[in-house]
């Protein structure tokens, strides 16, 4: 924070944040404590892979499963009818000892990448990270914190600037690797053991 005083100053002068997709829709949610209780009530420990197929049938649309961290779960997701999966350790905030998502990406792509789309979430902080994931077979990446920092400090302009930074970093890295088309980037641009 000391290295980014202007960002801190902007954060101090933004309006209070709320959970806009929950406030007004969930009963008795008025503060973080009640939100935590409500969130805990939304999880059913009895859910199984059989339920995924049933949910897909009821839903009738595309089904994406987030939170996959093993090739075994990836195979179960594919067998259950998922259209895509997202490798995610939820930023490590749920389980501090979880593997990094990029470490498990190659094994999961090898197991199911020809059957369903594989995306990656968690740990993306630069355009170079995005390029590494694409080189290892991910269809794309998801990014949360970087956009939230930009949004918090500068609103929509901050999000736009974040996108520009990530794009420019990825574009520059591709150029250094001798590529102009992200669809043609493969593992050959990576030094084994550096991801």
Regions found by a protein language model. Give the residues of each.
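Alpha/beta catalytic cores of nucleotide-metabolism and tRNA/nucleoside-modifying enzymes
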Residues: 18, 103-195
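Short loop-to-alpha-helix "cap/lid" segments that border enzyme active sites
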Residues: 47-53, 57, 99-113
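Glycine-enriched alpha-helix->loop->beta-strand junction motifs that scaffold or abut catalytic
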Residues: 58-62, 78-92, 112-115, 137-141
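Active-site entrance/lid segments in N-terminal catalytic domains of soluble metabolic enzymes
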Residues: 1-79, 91-94
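Glycine-rich, proline-tolerant flexible connector loops at the mouths of alpha/beta enzymes
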Residues: 36, 89-99, 148-152
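Short beta->alpha connector loops at strand-helix junctions that form conserved
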Residues: 66-67, 88-89, 122, 144-145
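Short, well-ordered secondary-structure micro-motifs
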Residues: 75-76, 96-98, 130-132, 153
């Amino acid at each position: 924070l000391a290295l980014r005083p202007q960002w801190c100053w902007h954060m101090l002068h933004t309006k209070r944040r709320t959970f806009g997709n929950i406030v007004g829709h969930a009963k008795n949610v008025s503060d973080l404590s009640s939100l935590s209780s409500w969130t805990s009530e939304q999880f059913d420990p009895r859910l199984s892979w059989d339920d995924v197929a049933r949910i897909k049938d009821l839903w009738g649309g595309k089904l994406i499963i987030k939170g996959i961290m093993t090739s075994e779960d990836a195979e179960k997701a594919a067998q259950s009818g998922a259209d895509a999966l997202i490798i995610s350790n939820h930023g490590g905030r749920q389980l501090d000892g979880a593997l990094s998502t990029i470490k498990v990406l190659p094994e999961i792509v090898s197991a199911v990448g020809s059957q369903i789309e594989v995306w990656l979430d968690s740990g993306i902080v630069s355009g170079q990270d995005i390029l590494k994931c694409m080189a290892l077979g991910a269809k794309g990446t998801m990014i949360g914190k970087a956009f939230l920092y930009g949004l918090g400090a500068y609103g929509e302009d901050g999000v736009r600037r974040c996108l520009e930074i990530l794009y420019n970093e990825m574009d520059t890295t591709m150029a250094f690797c001798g590529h102009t088309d992200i669809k043609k980037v493969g593992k050959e641009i990576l030094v084994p053991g550096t991801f």
